[in-house]
């Protein structure tokens, strides 16, 4: 301007001496904590998304890449996020997340039981997910007890055996969905062996040597009955891997030959906490799976939307099946046979305990893993607990996990009292078939002919919930599983003590209660 004579020499000298720095806008402190589970998890999820976008642009299939190729795309995605000034919007509710971190700091010690891993570490680790049932949004999570001590994210990155939490997802749910069982069907709970002759170890001796209902089998998490149901499911559907092929694969469970093993219903297959939480989300969402997600939107530095989450969901179970499973899983929590979660919660917060809680526990061999997953109509909250390096815990590990989870849920309630949808209920879907059945057989009451003798089904009647077809007519071999001697024992020991005059019931099984 001076050379163009637009300003005088005096003005030019004054301008040169002026400190321009004082007019610069101050650098804003980014509201990002770059140390911790949250930062690294959000970044990793964003990198996965950008990788997929880049591969799509290049018309490259992820499955066709070797590890070197995947590493190259990952590095490219990380550079792209930084160089393009991407803004990542996550689903995490900061208040919820902070509350969960405070809760694990305050109550994580409840998990400790004095056991140690091979390195002498006595801290019992945990991974927790809080998921919105309707959308699959991850509202908050706990990656571990202390990031400074252990950076392994136990909610997302640690695959562990799932134990009995898989039973509703892979066996009872599909069997109800296919009309093979109803809520009060009878299942053999007699000592037995695997097909290869190995002795079968049950989870408890409660109600052994009899036929138990589906509801009671879940309440006590019996092992023998669920294997019988799974074998019947595989036989009737003509597919040893039916549950995975038609249910689990739709919910992104990891593919494994082990799903076809006879012992698969006991939870020997490994997966992570977020995947298992997602399975229960589907049941709590009327059978509709919404894939868990943490990234809502990614925009570049010009405001252009690079990615936005969209998911129409997948109907995995029928609404009838999901509602029956929730009715059964409510009994699991209310009975407190396998978890003290609800009684503990009632002592901490009776109002929160009045929410409609459903859920399932799980333990693995030598108590190396302890699981508890609970849902209300609005959210699903999960917990895995165990040593970072797999090692046995004590038999109290399940109670410890239930105690910890009750305190975690209570803390979340005070952070957001609307979170758990207190007052909302899991209702039976209108399509559920309500069959009047004999308590003795779990099938429709009526006359039975065996060895030339004709007699009526003994005992009282009850209602069994079916998603398909309704209860069959009672037969001598009424249950799922069991040998000839098991049936002879059951009929011989129990039938004489039951009332055999069921004429008042015989006329009811043809009424339209099975609709």
Walk through the language-model features, giving the residues of each:
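Conserved catalytic neighborhood of penicillin-recognizing serine enzymes
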Residues: 28-30, 181-244, 261, 301-331
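Ser/Thr/Gly/Pro-rich low-complexity, disordered linker/stalk segments of secreted
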Residues: 493-515
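Second-shell loop/turn segments in exported
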Residues: 2, 25-30, 83-91, 153-161, ...
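Periplasmic/cell-envelope proteins involved in peptidoglycan metabolism and beta-lactam response
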Residues: 2-30, 79-156, 165-168, 182
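Non-catalytic, structured segments within soluble enzyme domains
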Residues: 2-87, 91, 249, 263-264
């Amino acid at each position: 301007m001076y050379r163009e004579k637009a300003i005088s020499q005096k003005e030019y000298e004054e301008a040169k001496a002026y400190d321009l720095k004082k007019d610069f806008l101050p650098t804003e402190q980014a509201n990002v904590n770059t140390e911790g589970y949250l930062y690294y998890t959000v970044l990793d999820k964003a990198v996965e998304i950008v990788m997929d976008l880049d591969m799509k642009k290049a018309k490259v299939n992820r499955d066709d890449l070797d590890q070197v190729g995947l590493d190259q795309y990952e590095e490219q995605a990380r550079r792209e996020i930084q160089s393009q000034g991407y803004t990542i919007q996550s689903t995490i509710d900061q208040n919820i997340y902070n509350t969960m971190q405070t809760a694990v700091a305050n109550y994580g010690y409840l998990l400790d039981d004095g056991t140690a891993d091979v390195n002498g570490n006595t801290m019992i680790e945990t991974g927790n997910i809080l998921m919105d049932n309707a959308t699959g949004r991850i509202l908050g999570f706990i990656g571990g007890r202390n990031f400074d001590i252990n950076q392994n994210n136990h909610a997302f990155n640690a695959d562990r055996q799932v134990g009995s939490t898989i039973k509703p997802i892979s066996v009872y749910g599909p069997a109800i969905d296919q009309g093979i069982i109803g809520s009060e069907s009878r299942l053999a709970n007699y000592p037995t062996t695997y097909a290869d002759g190995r002795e079968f170890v049950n989870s408890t001796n409660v109600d052994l040597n009899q036929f138990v209902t589906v509801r009671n089998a879940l309440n006590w998490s019996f092992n023998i009955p669920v294997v019988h149901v799974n074998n019947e499911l595989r036989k009737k559907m003509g597919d040893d891997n039916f549950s995975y092929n038609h249910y689990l694969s739709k919910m992104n469970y990891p593919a494994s030959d082990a799903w076809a093993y006879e012992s698969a219903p006991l939870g020997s297959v490994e997966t992570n906490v977020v995947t298992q939480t997602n399975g229960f989300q589907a049941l709590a969402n009327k059978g509709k799976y919404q894939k868990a997600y943490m990234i809502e939107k990614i925009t570049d530095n010009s405001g252009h939307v690079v990615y936005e989450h969209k998911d129409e969901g997948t109907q995995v179970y029928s609404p009838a099946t999901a509602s029956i499973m929730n009715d059964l899983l409510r009994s699991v929590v209310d009975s407190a046979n396998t978890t003290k979660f609800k009684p503990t919660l009632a002592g901490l917060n009776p109002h929160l305990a009045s929410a409609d809680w459903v859920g399932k526990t799980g333990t693995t061999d030598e108590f190396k893993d302890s699981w508890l997953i609970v849902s209300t109509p609005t959210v699903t909250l999960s917990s895995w607990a165990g040593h970072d390096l797999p090692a046995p815990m004590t038999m109290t590990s399940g109670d410890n996990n239930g105690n910890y989870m009750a305190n975690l849920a209570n803390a979340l309630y005070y952070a957001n009292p609307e979170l758990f949808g207190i007052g909302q209920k899991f209702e039976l879907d209108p399509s559920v078939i309500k069959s009047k059945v004999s308590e003795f057989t779990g099938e429709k009451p009526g006359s039975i002919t065996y060895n030339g003798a004709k007699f009526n089904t003994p005992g009282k009647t009850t209602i069994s919930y079916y998603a398909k077809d309704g209860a069959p007519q009672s037969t001598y071999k009424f249950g799922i599983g069991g040998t000839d001697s098991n049936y002879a024992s059951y009929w011989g020991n129990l039938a004489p003590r039951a009332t055999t005059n069921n004429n008042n019931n015989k006329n009811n099984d043809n009424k339209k209660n099975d609709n």
